[in-house]
Amino acid sequence: MWKRWLALALVAVAWVRAEEELRSKSKICANVFCGAGRECAVTEKGEPTCLCIEQCKPHKRPVCGSNGKTYLNHCELHRDACLTGSKIQVDYDGHCKEKKSVSPSASPVVCYQSNRDELRRRIIQWLEAEIIPDGWFSRGSNYSEILDKYFKNFDNGDSRLDSSEFLKFVEQNETAINITTYPDQENNKLLRGLCVDALIELSDENADWKLSFQEFLKCLNPSFNPPEKKCALEDETYADGAETEVDCNRCVCACGNWVCTAMTCDGKNQKGAQTQTEEEMTRYVQELQKHQETAEKTKRVSTKEI
């Protein structure tokens, strides 16, 4: 019998202590604001501090976070943000809608201006590192001489560097060529070739897709600022990275040119597959390029008039 009374007494003491701690915490934390996902706690020294909420109330009011994750309520979202140290906001009320997965092949592999400029920056950095100042009794190598050396090493004898020769030149430096935008290595290899083409286009004054030494020198001149080219379509101009669609194919603006996929449409796009042949797709891309050329000619004429 006495054991039963002892147990009841211990429970009563524990309850009293808990009540006292709660009153003490309420008093210490009365003027402390911790923000969403955090709550005030009392340290061993009796000082207030803000910690992530230990447990949220289980009421159901689902919300979708900006990270694409569904939470039971607002409290759980802010608690997760606190625990992970990340910024998560309420995107909308309710469960997150399932996002349609986009196949990697849904977008064409392209070299954006940022990719082109990054490759160019790395090449210039590599070449500048090979500059040797003149010594007391020896002659060094300046930037133009270093470029001349590489130009002659990779030129096949026609005094021009085509895209394959330019690519071989760039491949001499691991850091310069190591552009990895895509998870697939084959796509990254294709990207390097496309960015080399984009570099050639920068200074290819006679549009023969080959660079003379003077064009090569201009392309990699550290003081040269590559222009930001836009794509034209239906009297509108689009910035680098802009996209448009035709049936199930996607076209992307990259370095001033429209680049499109050439997928065979099926399912809901079956009609497109039946009506649009490969030849028609080619014509569509050519039409995009004509819009681009027309816009550039108009721009040049306007510049001359000014």
From Swiss-Prot:
It is found in: Secreted. Residues 46-98 form the Kazal-like domain. Residues 1-18 form the signal peptide. Residues 231-285 form the VWFC domain. GO terms for molecular function: calcium ion binding; heparin binding. Disulfide bonds join C29-C40, C34-C50, C52-C82, C56-C75, C64-C96. Keywords: Disulfide bond, Glycoprotein, Heparin-binding, Phosphoprotein, Repeat, Secreted, Signal. Residues 142-176, 191-226 form the EF-hand domain. One of its GO terms (biological process) is endothelial cell differentiation. Residues 28-51 form the Follistatin-like domain. PROSITE patterns: EF_HAND_2, KAZAL_2. It comes from the Eukaryota. One of its GO terms (cellular component) is extracellular space. The modification Phosphoserine is found at S163. The keyword Lipid biosynthesis does not apply. Glycans are attached at N142, N173, N178. Coiled coil: none annotated. Secreted glycoprotein that is involved in various physiological processes, such as angiogenesis, regulation of the immune response, cell proliferation and differentiation. Plays a role in the development of the central nervous system, skeletal system, lungs, and ureter. Promotes endothelial cell survival, migration and differentiation into network structures in an AKT-dependent manner. Also promotes survival of cardiac myocytes. Initiates various signaling cascades by activating different receptors on the cell surface such as DIP2A, TLR4 or BMP receptors. Homodimer. Interacts with SCN10A. Interacts with DIP2A; DIP2A may act as a cell surface receptor for FSTL1. Interacts with BMP4. Interacts with CD14; this interaction promotes TL4-mediated signaling cascade. PANTHER family: FOLLISTATIN-RELATED, FOLLISTATIN-RELATED PROTEIN 1. This is Follistatin-related protein 1. The lineage of its organism: Eukaryota, Metazoa, Chordata, Craniata, Vertebrata. The gene is FSTL1.
